[in-house]
Amino acid sequence: MITSPVVIKNFITPEDAQTLIDEINRPSETNPYPEYYKTRYGGTAYPYNKTVLAIQRKYSLLSNDTHQRLNPEETKQIKTFKSFGSVWLEGSAANPHIDDQSPEEFIEYSTVIYLDDTFTGGDLYFPDLGFTYKPEKYDGIFFISDGDLWRHGISKIESGKRTTLLYMHTTQTEHPEGYTIVDPDLN
């Protein structure tokens, strides 16, 4: 298993990153989200449409494979639980937190993909690992989400707007309350 976050340069193509940003700002179409989205914690900046889903699926599969390769001791198949877009505006920040929290305790791995560089600040930091990452456009960062050691936060956005594509991954297939764990659109 990895012992610190792993950064992969140019994980997303410039064209795909720009398409996602364009879809946030001017959706090509909007459709209702599937029923299982109601059990998801949080929201997304992305509209639900075929353009966004095609890109999300492409990088979901790449992210699943990347986590599997980075964590060869993982014997179960890593799949995407959810994908979402986030837009952080000037003044935004996030205190250290873990991704595997109620009601989504089954999240085991996370991926953050940076779509732009039109901001200052917004570093991703892991206080218990002594690791800080200054985001760069098109990079993907991969880390384990399971447990307090992997607590992470985002420093204050000093200027501009920070746009990301995020994935939460799991090896689990069933939820005790019957929720859809593995996103059928993305795996």
Residue spans of the language-model regions?
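Short, conserved beta-strand element in jelly-roll/cupin
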Residues: 87-89, 102-120, 168-169
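Catalytic core of Fe(II)/2-oxoglutarate
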Residues: 107, 120-187
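Non-heme Fe(II)/2-oxoglutarate
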Residues: 1-77, 183-187
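Conserved hydrophobic/aromatic beta-strand scaffold that supports enzyme active sites
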Residues: 5-7, 85, 112-114, 140-142, ...
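A short glycine-rich, His/Asp/Glu-containing loop-to-beta-strand
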Residues: 6, 77-92
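Histidine-centered catalytic micro-motifs
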Residues: 93-101
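Short beta-strand segments enriched in hydrophobic/aromatic residues
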Residues: 12, 24, 115, 145, ...
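Residue-level preference for beta-strand/loop junctions
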Residues: 4, 77, 105-107, 161
